[in-house]
């Protein structure tokens, strides 16, 4: 198994698919990476040379924010919104949907399990 950005990527998959196991790299970024390194799209991870793996590592380290760094950046951005006290920050603080979804019904994923209210009848 090749280890890139602290993640063991599967050896039996194509490189484009295997790179997507790294948090922060999706289809588009994976395709860009193999284009920069000039690896054929149908090549499997097990067929990569050590030099190619090293080149992929260098491209990711140089050009992309991945794994822990990306998670930290997102957390900092959310904390900044909460500290500003803007609408999006308040929604994050209260654990409600941030992007305008309805909350009268639904939004159970964001709000958590339903809380029963004593004495309320249908």
From Swiss-Prot:
One of its GO terms (molecular function) is tRNA binding. InterPro entries: Rbsml_uS13_C (IPR027437), Ribosomal_uS13 (IPR001892), Ribosomal_uS13-like_H2TH (IPR010979), Ribosomal_uS13_bac-type (IPR019980), Ribosomal_uS13_CS (IPR018269). GO terms for biological process: translation. Residues 95-122 are annotated as: Disordered. The keyword DNA-binding does not apply. Keywords: Ribonucleoprotein, Ribosomal protein, RNA-binding, rRNA-binding, tRNA-binding. GO terms for cellular component: cytosol; small ribosomal subunit. PANTHER family: 30S RIBOSOMAL PROTEIN S13/40S RIBOSOMAL PROTEIN S18, SMALL RIBOSOMAL SUBUNIT PROTEIN US13M. Part of the 30S ribosomal subunit. Forms a loose heterodimer with protein S19. Forms two bridges to the 50S subunit in the 70S ribosome. Belongs to the universal ribosomal protein uS13 family. Located at the top of the head of the 30S subunit, it contacts several helices of the 16S rRNA. In the 70S ribosome it contacts the 23S rRNA (bridge B1a) and protein L5 of the 50S subunit (bridge B1b), connecting the 2 subunits; these bridges are implicated in subunit movement. Contacts the tRNAs in the A and P-sites. This is Small ribosomal subunit protein uS13. The lineage of its organism: Bacteria, Pseudomonadati, Pseudomonadota, Alphaproteobacteria, Hyphomicrobiales. The gene is rpsM.
